[in-house]
A protein has these predicted regions:
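Alpha-helical and His/Cys-centered functional microenvironments
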Residues: 14, 60-62, 325
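Short, Lys/Arg-enriched N-terminal segments with co-localized hydrophobic residues
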Residues: 11-23
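Long, well-ordered mid-to-C-terminal structural blocks that present hydrophobic/aromatic surfaces
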Residues: 290-374
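Intrinsically disordered, low-complexity segments enriched in serine/proline and basic residues
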Residues: 1-10
Length: 374
């Protein structure tokens, strides 16, 4: 560059002006996602130290009761998180590094770190680094180069820091209560165990999820009705018995602190038939016959309506989770089972049937507190 250009464009002054106007931000600093001054005040001055009430989670009650200690960060992050598994597969990671039982935990962690490098903008990228910062005090971005150091440091802390046990984490982060996801036939033994621990820092309460009782089209429906019958201590020979058994188990859940139900539905259900008609459908299925789509929806409408009325009477919130196509990969379902990263979003119409279902409850003033997910 010529001397006259240097005089015309004094780099030192340009850099000073630029630095003043555009200060380099720390990677995911304390104001991450807090874009305005108002947001920063609301979070830091009010929300930050509030107790956590997680009313919809998939934590395992036994692991909570036994105060599980993770041996590696791979165990904590990749032992069962099918959201991470899904994005690893999208990155072309071999299945052995995703769910392999005999794969070295460090190799799995490196595969996750390499995947994360390509996932910037995905919530998993944010969650991963927030967890590294808040639980381990690690502020370095996770990638292939940093994986070994982060792996070793996190594992050291898991081994030495009691605050990183399940109970320790719940205490450290001021978890007031969590609502686990539980089947009506569950005996809630681990919830009882936790409730009996005088020093336990949080409430662990069941949430009522009767998907198997509504899944009349499923191959294991008949076996499940037998299981529900045993749990309720009553014979189930009719649709009225199904409802009675479910309500009986709901009351047991309520006695254990339950405040919410949870239902996974592909779309809304709104085929209203009489009890006699639905009883014929139930009997037909229990005898091993196949049902039409209309019969399946009529059964689900009847049972869900009865449960919604029971929720309303008991002040139980009803969570309805729509629009997922489950278990799309039959080969991997056979190998790994459900909830392993092979669900997808559905494109069926929802609004009309959901409106009709809720309106039917509204006529009699029996709409429970309702939370909708897609």
């Amino acid at each position: 560059m010529r001397s006259m250009d240097i005089e015309r464009y004094p780099f030192s002054r340009m850099e000073s002006s630029f630095d003043k106007e555009y200060q380099m931000k720390q990677f995911m600093d304390d104001n991450f996602l807090l874009k305005t001054k108002t947001a920063q005040i609301l979070f830091h001055d009010y929300a930050k130290d509030e107790m956590i009430y997680d009313y919809h989670c998939h934590l395992i009650p036994q692991e909570i009761a036994e105060n599980k200690r993770f041996t590696t960060i791979t165990d904590a992050w990749l032992g069962g998180d099918h959201y991470k598994w899904r994005v690893m597969r999208a990155n072309g990671v071999d299945e052995a590094l995703v769910t392999g039982k005999d794969t070295d935990p460090f190799d799995k962690f490196v595969a996750w770190a390499e995947t994360l490098e390509r996932a910037m903008g995905n919530p998993l990228y944010h969650w991963t680094h927030l967890e590294l910062q808040r639980y381990f005090g690690i502020t370095e971005p996770l990638n292939k180069r940093s994986a070994k150091a982060i792996y070793d440091e996190a594992n050291r802390q898991f081994k030495e820091n009691e605050a990183l046990s399940v109970k320790g984490i719940m205490k450290e982060f001021k978890v007031y209560a969590v609502g686990t996801t539980d089947d009506p036939a569950d005996d809630l033994a681990w919830h009882k165990n936790i409730a009996g621990q005088a020093d336990f820092p949080s409430k662990v309460i069941p949430s009522y999820r009767p998907d198997k009782a509504l899944g009349i089209e499923k191959s294991d429906f008949v076996a499940y009705i037998q299981k529900l019958s045993a749990a309720a201590g009553m014979e189930i020979a009719s649709i009225s018995d199904v409802v009675a058994a479910l309500v009986k188990r709901l009351d047991f859940f309520v006695s254990m602190g339950c405040r919410a139900s949870d239902h996974a539905l592909v779309t809304g259900v709104a085929i209203f038939k009489s009890e006699a008609e639905v009883n014929a459908i139930f009997t037909k299925r229990m005898e091993g016959a196949a049902l039409s789509d209309e019969e399946i929806e009529a059964y689900k409408t009847f049972v869900l309506t009865a449960l919604a009325r029971a929720y309303s009477k008991r002040d139980i919130a009803m969570q309805l989770h729509f629009a997922s196509i489950r278990d799309n990969n039959g080969k991997m379902f056979a190998a790994l089972g459900p909830d392993t990263g092979y669900d997808a979003s559905h494109d069926l119409s929802l609004a009309a049937k959901l409106s009709a279902f809720l309106n039917n409850l509204s006529v009699t003033g029996e709409v429970p507190k309702t939370i909708l997910y897609t």
